[in-house]
């Protein structure tokens, strides 16, 4: 009987959670339809990621995407899955994917009111060595009265109504940020549902970990070089920060959310506009971190305030615990004033 007593009979799934939030806001239920469909794609991708070796899904598919990355077989599969489930949710009108050069306009008979920007498989260069990868998404409402077009996706991150990511790691986790905050759901493979495990997640005010690719150190600007040196050799003789960098944005940002600290993918001499894409990488992650009480900046401005001009626009990003990001900004402003 003890085993039965330990089984939760009042579980909160993603569907239940979003329905409850929609009921409070007197919503139409379209967001529930959209997120339900997205969860279906995430479950399918999670299974595909775990079966990749057996199903011969590793390796290059023979093409490059619009941003020049080599496309893996799993990328192609994941993109097709997300596009198809979002179209069939009857809740979307415009889809922007890292893998497609142009925005996808949903057929008139399937259209809803939401615009979704997504990276179907972020960190895919890590697939072959089994490092954690993920799916990132940002959801906007269509605000123009015109027929759906690519322009509907060119909204600042402040307009997001929901954003988040799925992390395919030792378990599959869905992190969902909405107006009410950030909540984490774990995929229970036994019942095939995402179960709420962490409600109203908040990032630490200050962490003890910094995360960036120091292989580009020779191209860092002086402000970044000074900041990293202060983390390694604190001027007040406090404990130095630990360095952690996976190279998969979902994994690095999730660790930053859970443990605190700072994640940086700044501009440098080789990439003056940064390397990460604004609509489906920077904005969703910035939204999650801000809703958790953190900060996200380019150094010059808040990430969520950027008005995009291109669906594949790039942006620098520095995000994490508010005290850590504030310290970075103080050093950045000091150097900018010189």
From Swiss-Prot:
Where Mg(2+) 3 binds, per the record, is at 119, 122, 281
| Cofactors | Mg(2+)
User: Single GO cellular component annotation?
Assistant: cytoplasm
In this UniProt entry, the residues modified to N6-succinyllysine are: 151
* Entry's cofactor comment: Binds 3 Mg(2+) ions per subunit.
Q: What EC number(s) does the entry state?
A: 3.1.3.11
**Residues where Phosphotyrosine occurs?**
216, 245, 265
Q: Which reaction does it catalyse?
A: beta-D-fructose 1,6-bisphosphate + H2O = beta-D-fructose 6-phosphate + phosphate
Q: What protein am I looking at?
A: Fructose-1,6-bisphosphatase 1
Q: Which residues bind substrate?
A: 122-125, 213-216, 244-249, 265, 275-277
- What gene codes for this chain? FBP1
Q: Which family does it belong to?
A: Belongs to the FBPase class 1 family.
């Amino acid at each position: 009987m003890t085993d039965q007593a330990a089984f939760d009979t009042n579980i909160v799934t993603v569907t239940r959670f979003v329905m409850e939030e929609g009921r409070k806001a007197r919503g139409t239920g379209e967001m529930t339809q959209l997120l339900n469909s997205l969860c279906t794609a995430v479950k399918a991708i999670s299974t595909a990621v775990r079966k990749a070796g057996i199903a011969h899904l590793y390796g290059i598919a023979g093409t490059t995407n619009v941003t020049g990355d080599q496309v893996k077989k799993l990328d192609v599969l994941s993109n097709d899955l997300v596009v198809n489930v979002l179209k069939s949710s009857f809740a979307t009108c415009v889809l922007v994917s890292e893998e497609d050069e142009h925005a996808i306009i949903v057929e008139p008979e399937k259209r809803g009111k939401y615009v979704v920007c997504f990276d179907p498989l972020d960190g895919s260069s890590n697939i072959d060595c089994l490092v954690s990868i993920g799916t990132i998404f940002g959801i906007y409402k269509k605000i123009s009265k015109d027929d759906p077009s690519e322009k509907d996706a060119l909204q600042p991150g402040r307009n997001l109504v929901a954003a988040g990511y799925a992390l395919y790691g030792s378990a599959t986790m869905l992190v969902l940020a909405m107006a009410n905050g950030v909540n984490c759901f774990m995929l229970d493979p036994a019942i095939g549902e995402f179960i709420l495990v962490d409600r109203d997640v908040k990032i630490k005010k200050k962490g003890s970990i910094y995360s960036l690719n120091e292989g580009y150190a020779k191209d860092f600007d002086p402000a970044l070089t000074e900041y990293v040196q202060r983390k390694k050799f604190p001027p007040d003789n406090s404990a130095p920060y630990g360095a952690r960098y996976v190279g998969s944005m979902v994994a690095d940002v999730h660790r930053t959310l859970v443990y605190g600290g700072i994640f940086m993918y700044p501009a440098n001499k080789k990439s003056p506009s940064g390397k990460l894409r604004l609509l489906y990488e920077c904005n969703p992650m910035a939204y999650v971190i801000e809703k958790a009480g953190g900060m996200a900046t380019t150094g010059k401005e808040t990430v969520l305030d950027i008005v995009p001009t291109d669906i594949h626009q790039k942006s620098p990003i520095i995000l994490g615990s508010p005290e850590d990001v504030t310290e970075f900004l103080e050093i950045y402003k000091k150097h900018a004033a010189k």
